[in-house]
């Protein structure tokens, strides 16, 4: 049997951290077993779908390096890959369930359903159980009501059964059929509900293993019921634990203190491979506690048995550490492929070399680029106050000896060292006066590099009065 996994988002929002991790674990599992990873779009709820939701899902998965073998647009025997293109299939199968006695029409209006709920609450039943009254009506009455076209189709749950599965993450899980209400499989608008459509899709696409969030645990017995009604083989399920913030609370899209969507991290310029690596460790560990993996080694190492049963903490500092580590080891030319700087390639290369070790993301390069691309016209009051208290001798010597004709980093650096030896000073006493006079700030990269990057025209103008 070929391993086939899937990630099946709804285009009701952009790719969330939790969804990305679900996609990644399904992808890693499939690739570890030389299987296929499928991207399917669950777009049956038109009222909630947003513009570019599907596009965001696909583009950000590709940015992460999670490449589907099949996706919307693929021409295979398993498609189509959007639920909105399979409505006839769902409706046909729902009719089959009715014929087999596993489903039935229900004609309740909202008021009648609310009355049922109130009556059950009064009896101490707080988890709604549908009363199956419509199973008792005559065929004549049923046909009459069907003409009005106001009905849903409900699945008839076998109350005598226990619905059990051996969860790939959590072990044996069981639900009593008596605790599950007869649930809607086809809504009044003719569209399938999630729990019905997802089973049909997984069967049609021959999905063998499903890793998903723990919020789907309560959906699983309903889905198993559908598989059993059709006598279809049930895939293996694994339910992942939640991802939490620093306070131990589940990540919420409403929490503005942390970016929740992959697009945010992409736009900030985080290293995609670093994010891929970091995401894999949110709920999975390698046997030897290794943390750095390239794409291929992570696929090779992935073992679902090492998926955590405890919640995973989204540590932004750890992500920053990963991204910084990846960027620091990249070839300079690869970094430059991701940046748009000046027209001077020699300057660009020196600039990247200067800030490579300190940059967490590509946005950090741009932030530093602004300092040199749009240099200050004068020293601000705070810096001026610091500068006035310093000995100006290092500045005067530097201004008189700097070689503008042969603008060279090594010569600038050697001159600074020479001044230190001549005045018998080091550290802040040597560097701070020159730094403030040349860069108009008291911090930054190595001084000689900052001076070279600012360029001889700007430095000559700033040092003119100190000659």
UniProtKB/Swiss-Prot annotation:
Subcellular location: Cytoplasm
Keywords, ordered alphabetically: Aminoacyl-tRNA synthetase, ATP-binding, Cytoplasm, Ligase, Nucleotide-binding, Protein biosynthesis
Entry coiled-coil feature ranges: none
GO molecular function, one term: glutamate-tRNA ligase activity
Motif, 'KMSKS' region: chain positions: 250-254
Native species: Mesomycoplasma hyopneumoniae (strain 232) (Mycoplasma hyopneumoniae)
InterPro entries (UniProt xref): aa-tRNA-synth_I_cd-bd, aa-tRNA-synth_I_codon-bd_sub2, aa-tRNA-synth_I_CS, aa_tRNA-synth_I_cd-bd_sf, Glu-tRNA-ligase_bac/mito, Glu/Gln-tRNA-synth, Glu/Gln-tRNA-synth_Ib_cat-dom, GluQ/Sye
Record EC number: 6.1.1.17
Enzyme class: ligase
UniProt-recorded name of the protein: Glutamate--tRNA ligase
PROSITE patterns: AA_TRNA_LIGASE_I
Functional note: Catalyzes the attachment of glutamate to tRNA(Glu) in a two-step reaction: glutamate is first activated by ATP to form Glu-AMP and then transferred to the acceptor end of tRNA(Glu).
GO cellular component, one term: cytosol
Gene: gltX
Binding site for ATP: 253
């Amino acid at each position: 049997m070929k391993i086939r996994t899937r990630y099946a988002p709804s285009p009701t929002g952009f790719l969330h951290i939790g969804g990305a991790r679900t996609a990644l674990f399904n992808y890693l599992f499939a690739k570890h077993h030389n299987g296929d990873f499928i991207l399917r779009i669950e777009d049956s709820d038109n009222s909630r779908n947003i513009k570019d939701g599907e596009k965001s899902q696909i583009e950000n998965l590709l940015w992460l390096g999670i490449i589907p073998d099949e996706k919307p647009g693929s021409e295979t025997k398993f498609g189509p890959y959007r639920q909105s293109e399979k409505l006839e299939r769902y409706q046909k199968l729902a009719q089959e369930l009715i014929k087999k006695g596993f489903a039935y029409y229900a004609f309740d209006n909202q008021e009648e359903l609310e009355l049922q709920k109130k009556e059950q609450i009064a009896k101490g039943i707080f988890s709604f159980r549908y009363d199956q009254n419509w199973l008792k009506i005559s065929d004549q009455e049923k046909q009459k009501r069907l003409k009005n076209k106001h009905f849903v189709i409900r699945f008839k749950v076998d109350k005598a059964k226990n619905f059990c599965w051996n969860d790939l993450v959590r072990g044996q899980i069981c639900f009593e059929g008596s605790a599950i209400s007869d649930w809607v499989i086809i809504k009044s608008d003719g569209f399938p509900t999630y729990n019905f459509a997802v089973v049909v899709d997984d069967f049609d696409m021959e999905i063998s293993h499903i890793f998903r969030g723990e919020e789907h645990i309560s959906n699983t017995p309903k889905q198993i019921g559908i598989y059993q009604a059709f006598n279809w083989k049930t895939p293996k399920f694994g339910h992942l634990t939640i991802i939490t913030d620093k306070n131990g609370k589940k990540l919420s899209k409403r929490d503005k203190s942390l970016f929740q969507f992959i697009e945010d991290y992409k736009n900030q310029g985080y290293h995609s491979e670093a994010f891929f690596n970091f995401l894999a460790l949110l709920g999975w560990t390698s046997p030897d506690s290794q943390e750095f993996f390239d794409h291929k080694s992570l696929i090779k190492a992935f073992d679902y048995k090492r998926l955590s049963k405890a919640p995973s903490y989204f540590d932004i500092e750890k992500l920053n550490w990963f991204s910084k580590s990846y960027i620091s080891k990249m070839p300079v030319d690869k970094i430059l492929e991701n940046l748009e700087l000046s027209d001077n390639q020699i300057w660009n290369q020196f600039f990247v070399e200067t800030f490579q070790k300190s940059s967490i993301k590509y946005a950090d390069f741009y932030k530093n680029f602004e300092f040199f691309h749009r240099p200050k016209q004068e020293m601000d009051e705070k810096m001026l106050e610091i500068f006035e208290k310093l000995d100006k001798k290092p500045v005067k010597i530097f201004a008189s000896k700097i070689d503008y004709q042969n603008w060279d980093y090594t010569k600038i650096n050697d001159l600074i060292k020479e001044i230190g030896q001549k005045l018998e000073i080091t550290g802040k006493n040597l560097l701070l006066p020159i730094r403030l006079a040349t860069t108009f700030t008291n911090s930054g990269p190595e001084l000689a590099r900052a001076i070279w990057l600012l360029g001889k025209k700007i430095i000559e103008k700033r040092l003119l009065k100190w000659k």
